[in-house]
Amino acid sequence: MKSPRRTTLCLMFIVIYSSKAALNWNYESTIHPLSLHEHEPAGEEALRQKRAVATKSPTAEEYTVNIEISFENASFLDPIKAYLNSLSFPIHGNNTDQITDILSINVTTVCRPAGNEIWCSCETGYGWPRERCLHNLICQERDVFLPGHHCSCLKELPPNGPFCLLQEDVTLNMRVRLNVGFQEDLMNTSSALYRSYKTDLETAFRKGYGILPGFKGVTVTGFKSGSVVVTYEVKTTPPSLELIHKANEQVVQSLNQTYKMDYNSFQAVTINESNFFVTPEIIFEGDTVSLVCEKEVLSSNVSWRYEEQQLEIQNSSRFSIYTALFNNMTSVSKLTIHNITPGDAGEYVCKLILDIFEYECKKKIDVMPIQILANEEMKVMCDNNPVSLNCCSQGNVNWSKVEWKQEGKINIPGTPETDIDSSCSRYTLKADGTQCPSGSSGTTVIYTCEFISAYGARGSANIKVTFISVANLTITPDPISVSEGQNFSIKCISDVSNYDEVYWNTSAGIKIYQRFYTTRRYLDGAESVLTVKTSTREWNGTYHCIFRYKNSYSIATKDVIVHPLPLKLNIMVDPLEATVSCSGSHHIKCCIEEDGDYKVTFHTGSSSLPAAKEVNKKQVCYKHNFNASSVSWCSKTVDVCCHFTNAANNSVWSPSMKLNLVPGENITCQDPVIGVGEPGKVIQKLCRFSNVPSSPESPIGGTITYKCVGSQWEEKRNDCISAPINSLLQMAKALIKSPSQDEMLPTYLKDLSISIDKAEHEISSSPGSLGAIINILDLLSTVPTQVNSEMMTHVLSTVNVILGKPVLNTWKVLQQQWTNQSSQLLHSVERFSQALQSGDSPPLSFSQTNVQMSSMVIKSSHPETYQQRFVFPYFDLWGNVVIDKSYLENLQSDSSIVTMAFPTLQAILAQDIQENNFAESLVMTTTVSHNTTMPFRISMTFKNNSPSGGETKCVFWNFRLANNTGGWDSSGCYVEEGDGDNVTCICDHLTSFSILMSPDSPDPSSLLGILLDIISYVGVGFSILSLAACLVVEAVVWKSVTKNRTSYMRHTCIVNIAASLLVANTWFIVVAAIQDNRYILCKTACVAATFFIHFFYLSVFFWMLTLGLMLFYRLVFILHETSRSTQKAIAFCLGYGCPLAISVITLGATQPREVYTRKNVCWLNWEDTKALLAFAIPALIIVVVNITITIVVITKILRPSIGDKPCKQEKSSLFQISKSIGVLTPLLGLTWGFGLTTVFPGTNLVFHIIFAILNVFQGLFILLFGCLWDLKVQEALLNKFSLSRWSSQHSKSTSLGSSTPVFSMSSPISRRFNNLFGKTGTYNVSTPEATSSSLENSSSASSLLN
């Protein structure tokens, strides 16, 4: 056995030998280490060149030499390691050629026997390469191995030699303290002091830390105060604690002692140099997450910190920390977070402390939310068809299983199918009638799919499934057998309230038009009722009531039998009216278009007359020769009707035939077709039974009017309808009663357009044919819910013909009898345009001589501005329409905007307007397919070919005016600008627009219009300020001027007059400003403004009446006394109660019909309801009463009193008359009497100006004459503002002679008041009480007039 000393000497010998040999070796040669053992590592490069520095001096190179030493006795290992650690480096060597230094000697690998195996373990800072750390080779008892990482112990010698490798480089962030004073130059990297410190310290650091295995370098990074704290970085492999202490000692020894380095202040921090593992890699909400921190150091001082909240983590119900030491060389700490939430996301720090070392490792984790996608609601039919509920998760989650649960009143299980790879699960339901018992239809069951991950995360979604039973339909049980013209209904009841669609079909599969049936949904079922008000033969057949839910159909069937019976309107009688000689007879007949099995009789009164049947091709007539002699007396009118009875014993009466029995000598006109008549007699006959040529195959329609003139019948009016148009009219009447009218409509519109185009000449000379076409369009416009481009083209082609210039004269004749035909036509065209749906085809554009149309379809939420221009060169007219895109954004997608322009329609619509009101311009109508409640604004520009005279108005055609016959209305429209030839209108709604001239209204831009505006605004403004000042003055002097009952009531009236007029004027000026500035005021706000203006102006008048009655009472009933509270109650009831009652009644009587306000201004309506009378009549009555009171007062003042000289009396009387008029006129509202002059048309504009001036300045008059002219008010104001001396002198002077108060008992005027109504002289009162009473009464009169 060799001694340790000998072994150590041998090792030193080998080291020195190797060093000397290395000096003579070629750099490119491979050098194998010497060994005391025969083993040499094969294929391993034993000598590695580490560094070569090229300089001008001899090159210094560094080598790493691996030496293997084998011992027969393992006890030699520790002494050798101790010896090597005791060496001081570098060890200098000498050679004749070069100097060789040994910088460090480190033990890397130690192999020892362990049973039958050899375990080779790595020293600190070294480890086996990853590729050698196989699971079956590592030392399980001593090593904790994580796949993909270094291991520290192997069971056998590696094939390439037993050498552990240096581990990856780490950067040690270190600091040490120098116990010297800190200088500011150390903060400046360019200062000499900084460079000196840095150089000296780095030199010492390199000498000291050079002994560390894998040392690469050291850098001083800065200095901090606190003595001097040096921060620096050391780049090396992970060192052992023993080595780092040894290196620190060498640093202190190498550094100049003047730096006073404190050995105990060394600290080292490594960041993210530890192994940090997070499981799972992708974290989802609810997972159990493990964070493992591993470092090959022996320390159990490990802590965890949550950086987001600077929170030190401790063991709890959600967090658990486990720390352990493995292999006596590795510290492992594990943080487990249970049921992680998004609030736990952030950066986590694992901190391990060992001596001077702090090892920090940081990891930021994100918590992903779990999103389970599923249909929120589903409806499932209980028809045994499979329905799948699907749930899928978003994100790459490692799901382990999916569970389905259900909760509800009924239990309907399904079959789950889960595809973990696609993160989806399907639950298939197959519900049948047994699982959905009666009454359970509509029951809701909640199905929950819950996804569970391998790490504990759970995500779920609820699917609300409503189970629908197959509908059981119950249809009207009674047989339906009706006759033509009668109504019938079929009721179809479902015991299920859930359905997607309900419709009715004929047996041929034709859908019944939806206008014929209504469907209602109830809690426990549904009901659909097919109602036919006028049955025809087309309704004869079988009908199916169909409830559809998804692909399930429930059908109920009902047969309908319709027996032939002519409709009353289709029975043609002749004559409509006739004259019959009392001794003669007359042929009467009733005709129908289709034959049938009918029993027909004629009836007059209680008598029944037989009928003879006559068939003439398609026309079937029943005739009777009426004998006038059968009537008991002559000069009588007899009504005769036909009575049709069919096989079902249902009957119908024809229109009545009126026979006028007259003596034969009165008859002068005779005609075999028209009949007989007396002079001046006017009768109507159906055109087909008149002298107008007609054929049974193509009968004409309409009526013709004859008048007996002399001995001849003259044609007075011809309203006959040509045969082709009459045929179209009859077809239209039948179409709207047909069950398949929507399918027949396109073909009919095409035939109508072709026929009207061919019959243009006949229409231009036949008012009856023109009226028939209008009736046809009106009937058909109620049919469609959707109109395509082709149908709209046919409609406009028809309209183009009947609006042509050749037909305009026919319109005049037509509207002499039917005034609403033009409005009816316009309404029909608007209804067609509102139903226009272009679908996928381009928007329709139509242009003809008399009508043009443009349209646009809203396809997106950001449409373009709607701009259309229409030009009619033949009429020299044009117009533009603009709707800003901001208003179009409020419309539904696929909405259609349609604008049509008509150059001749205004002349037709305006025939009831005065000629000088007519402005020659287009009529443009704009409609939207879907109604909108959002604010709307349309701008239109018209060319006006009648620019002269009056104010231009923007108007629209209001179909509800004039008992729904229509009329021009300006509500919601105003003129934005106009230069005479062109007018731009702005409106807040859609319909048909045009412009009119208003000759009676001054042009707002004229001098007169501007003058009236200035007077109104300035006057009302002054009035408001004056009234406010009046109220302020009254408030200031109130206590001083209301010391007796009369003064109190006088000032109470004045205050309420001023307050009511102030509020009324404020409302007035606000509304006027809004309308003058063309702001759109909503109808509700306009109604409210009108109500308050009405109420407060009426209050002004009634308080004026109260003041007048108070004056009359105090002057007439001098000795009558009434308490203040009674007078006050009566005054307020009269002043506010009466106006409120009148205003509320007016509003309640007119607003339900929307005729409370005017069309273009917020004030009481006049044209439709005469609501203005609710203001005018009370106001005029009050003015008359106050005028009467004024006359009485002035008359009594003028009456002479005893003892006055005539000249003095005359002067005093004139003064009192002037003062009374000046006070009473503004106070009692006499100026409103001028309003009578403005009511009548054609009134001189001077009266308008006078009326405006007097009334708008009424507030100023009340302030001056009703308030400030009162002596008591003046005295109170003077006293209030401390002018006591002047007031005292004034009082003294006014107490003498002529300054005696004019209404004191001693004054002549007071005596005159006492002599009212024939009483003369004065009262001689002997008691103090009576004197006091007389004084109060006298002062009462004074306070009323002053």
From Swiss-Prot:
- According to the UniProt record, list the residues that bear Phosphothreonine: 1300
Q: At what positions is Phosphoserine found?
A: 1307
Name the keywords, alphabetized: Cell membrane, Disulfide bond, G-protein coupled receptor, Glycoprotein, Immunoglobulin domain, Membrane, Phosphoprotein, Receptor, Repeat, Signal, Transducer, Transmembrane, Transmembrane helix
Domain GAIN-B stretches: 842-1003
Q: Sugar-bearing residues?
A: 73, 94, 106, 188, 256, 272, 301, 315, 328, 398, 472, 487, 505, 540, 627, 649, 666, 820, 931, 963, 982
Compartments where located: Cell membrane
Bias (Low complexity): 1329-1346
Q: What is its main location?
A: membrane
Instruction: Name all Ig-like domain ranges.
Output: 267-368, 369-466, 471-561
**Positions of transmembrane segments:** 1007-1027, 1054-1074, 1091-1111, 1129-1149, 1174-1194, 1221-1241, 1245-1265
- Report the Pfam families cross-referenced here: 7tm_2 (PF00002), ADGRF3_N (PF25387), GPS (PF01825), Ig_3 (PF13927), SEA (PF01390)
Outcome (variant: residue 1256 to A): Increased activation by exogenous agonists
The signal peptide annotation in the UniProt record is 1-21
Provide the Gene Ontology terms for cellular component: apical part of cell; cell surface; cytoplasmic vesicle; membrane; plasma membrane
The ranges of region (GPS) come to 954-1003
Q: How does it sit in the membrane?
A: Multi-pass membrane protein
- Disordered: where is this region? 1327-1346
The record's section on InterPro entries has:
Adhesion_GPCR, GAIN_B, GAIN_dom_sf, GPCR_2-like_7TM, GPCR_2_Ig-hepta-like_rcpt, GPCR_2_secretin-like, GPCR_2_secretin-like_CS, GPS
Site residues, Cleavage = 51-52, 226-227, 990-991
Q: Name one GO molecular function term.
A: G protein-coupled receptor activity
UniProt region (Tethered agonist), positions on chain: 991-1006
Lineage: superkingdom: Eukaryota
Give tissue specificity per the record.
Answer: Expressed in lung endothelial cells and in alveolar type II (ATII) cells (at protein level). Expressed high levels in subcutaneous adipose tissue in lean individuals and at lower levels in visceral fat. Expression levels in subcutaneous adipose tissue drastically drop in obese individuals.
Instruction: Outline the subunit composition.
Output: Homodimer; disulfide-linked. Heterodimer of 2 chains generated by proteolytic processing; the large extracellular N-terminal fragment and the membrane-bound C-terminal fragment predominantly remain associated and non-covalently linked. Fragment generates by the processing enzyme furin remains attached to the extracellular N-terminal fragment. Interacts (via N-terminal extracellular domain) with SFTPD.
Q: Which family does it belong to?
A: Belongs to the G-protein coupled receptor 2 family. Adhesion G-protein coupled receptor (ADGR) subfamily.
State the name under which the record lists this protein. Adhesion G protein-coupled receptor F5
**Which organism is this protein's natural source?**
Homo sapiens
